[in-house]
Amino acid sequence: MSRLTCLAFPGRSIPMAVLERLSVAARELPASVRALRAVPGVDQVLVLSTCERTEVYAWWTDEADPAALLRALAGQRGLGPEPLLEHAVGLTGREAVQHLLRVTAGLDSFVRGESDIVGQVRAAVQAARAEGAVGLEVQRLVDAAVNTSRRVHRSTGAGLAAGSVASTAVAAVAGLLPDGLAGRDLLVVGTGQVAVSVVAAAREAGARLTVCGRDPERAAAIAPAGARVLGLDDLPGALLDADAVVFGTSSPERLLRAGDLGPGLSEHRSGRELVVVDLCVPRNVDPDVRGVPGVRLLDLTDLRGAAVPGRRPSAPAPAALELAEQIVAQEVDRFLHWWVDRAAAEPVRRLRADVEACVREEVARATRGLSPDLEPLVAEGIRRAVQHLAHGPTRRLLDAAAAGEDEVVALLAGLFAPSAEEDQAVPAYSPQPIGNTSNAAASATPRR
C-alpha cells in the first residue's frame, strides 16, 4: 500500500491566509488535477478542497516522491514550497486510507458527523475522473469512503452529532441576536450547497430570509416561498436592514470590505449590531470589517472556537464515536484485503504459469522413449516435485502482499517469474519524507 500517498493541509492547524491560497474552487479542479498528475510517477490523483481542508491523494506507478507532489501543488497555487512544508501532513498506505475514510464520515470535521463532506468527496472524484486521473484503485478507495460514511451514519443514528458548518453558523447568529433568529432578517449571500444549507437551517429557526446571488435566477431557485431575492449589486442596500448576513459563495473575491460599510451604517441601523458570518475559503469578507463599529464578524476560525454564543461544540456520545471508529477500521481492512488480493494475483498467476510450463517441458523430456504405461507415473512425479518446490515461494508471496511488503513481492515475482520485470503492478518502494529534495529550503520532513 506504499503506492498511495496523501498530502493533507487541515484547516484546524493551518493559518487561514495559507488555507485560502491552497483552496481549489470547483472550476479550478481540472487544472489542479492535470498539474498534479503530470508529476513523474503519478498514475491517479484526487484533489479534495473544502472550507476545512485541502488534500491531495496520489496513486503512484513507481517509487513515490511526495516532495515533487508538494512542489507541484505549491506551483499550481502560486506558492513556494516552504510555507507548505510547515503545515503539510504526509500519510502513506493504511494511514492514508484511514484518513480519507474518517474525513468522508465526518469524523475529522469540527462539526463531528457532518454529512456535507460526502458530496464534496463525490464532486472531487467526478472532476478527477473527467480528467482521466481516476483508475480502479482510487475509485474503489472513494467507494469505500462513501460506504463508510453511510454505515457510520446509519449505525450511530442520533448518537453522532448531526449538523453542518451551515447549521453551526446559524446557531451562532441566533446566539448573538438578543432574541434569537425567529422573526429576524437574515441575508444569505450565495447560491451553492453551503448557501442552500444555511437557508434550510435559517428557515427552521424562523428567520425572515433574503437570498442574494450573482445570478438572481439561481438565487430564486434556492429561496423558500416568501423570501426576497436580490442580485449582488443590491448587497450594500440589503445590509442596512438585515440583522445578520451569512456569506456562502465559491467566489475567490472579497465581496465585502470595511469601505463598503459607510459611516451612516450605524446611524441608519439605530445602533443595532450587524452580525456578519463568513463561511468561505477564500474569505468573502475582508478581515478589516472587524474594525467597523457596530459590526460583529465571525469566520471559520471563530466558529471552531467554543466562545461564540450559540456555538455548540460537537460532542458525540462516546459509544457512538467508538462504534464509528470501529466501522472505519473494518472498512479500512476491507479495502486493504481487496488491494492485497489484487496486488498478489498477477505475480502468483505468473509464477503458477511458469511452474506449469516447467512441468510440461520436464515431462516431455523425461518421458521421451518410455513405455506408455510408465509415462503417467513419471509425469505425476515430476509435477508433484515441481509444485512442492513452488509452494513455498507462492505462500511467501501471498504473505508478503498481505503484510504490505511491496519490496518482497516484487523480489519474489522477479526471481520466480522473470516476466514480472515487465509488469509494474506492485513496484518496489522505499518511503521517503517529503523534505527529501534538492531544494535546501524544502528539506524538512512534514508533520505526522
UniProtKB/Swiss-Prot annotation:
Sequence similarity: Belongs to the glutamyl-tRNA reductase family.
Site (Important for activity): 99
InterPro entries cross-referenced by the UniProt entry: 4pyrrol_synth_GluRdtase (IPR000343), 4pyrrol_synth_GluRdtase_dimer (IPR015896), 4pyrrol_synth_GluRdtase_N (IPR015895), GluRdtase_dimer_dom_sf (IPR036453), GluRdtase_N_sf (IPR036343), NAD(P)-bd_dom_sf (IPR036291), Shikm_DH/Glu-tRNA_Rdtase (IPR006151)
Compositionally skewed regions (Polar residues) per UniProt: 433-442
Amino acids binding NADP(+): 190-195
Active site per database record: 51 (nucleophile)
More info: During catalysis, the active site Cys acts as a nucleophile attacking the alpha-carbonyl group of tRNA-bound glutamate with the formation of a thioester intermediate between enzyme and glutamate, and the concomitant release of tRNA(Glu). The thioester intermediate is finally reduced by direct hydride transfer from NADPH, to form the product GSA.
Function in brief: Catalyzes the NADPH-dependent reduction of glutamyl-tRNA(Glu) to glutamate 1-semialdehyde (GSA).
Gene Ontology biological process terms in this record: protoporphyrinogen IX biosynthetic process from glutamate
Molecular functions per Gene Ontology: glutamyl-tRNA reductase activity; NADP binding
NCBIfam families in UniProt: hemA (TIGR01035)
Ligand binding (substrate): 50-53, 109, 114-116, 120
Protein name: Glutamyl-tRNA reductase 2
Species annotation: Nocardioides sp. (strain ATCC BAA-499 / JS614)
Recorded catalytic activity of this chain's protein: (S)-4-amino-5-oxopentanoate + tRNA(Glu) + NADP(+) = L-glutamyl-tRNA(Glu) + NADPH + H(+)
Keyword annotations: NADP, Oxidoreductase, Porphyrin biosynthesis
Disordered: region residues: 423-448
EC numbers: 1.2.1.70
Pathway the protein takes part in: Porphyrin-containing compound metabolism; protoporphyrin-IX biosynthesis; 5-aminolevulinate from L-glutamyl-tRNA(Glu): step 1/2
Domain notes: Possesses an unusual extended V-shaped dimeric structure with each monomer consisting of three distinct domains arranged along a curved 'spinal' alpha-helix. The N-terminal catalytic domain specifically recognizes the glutamate moiety of the substrate. The second domain is the NADPH-binding domain, and the third C-terminal domain is responsible for dimerization.
Subunit structure of this chain's protein: Homodimer.
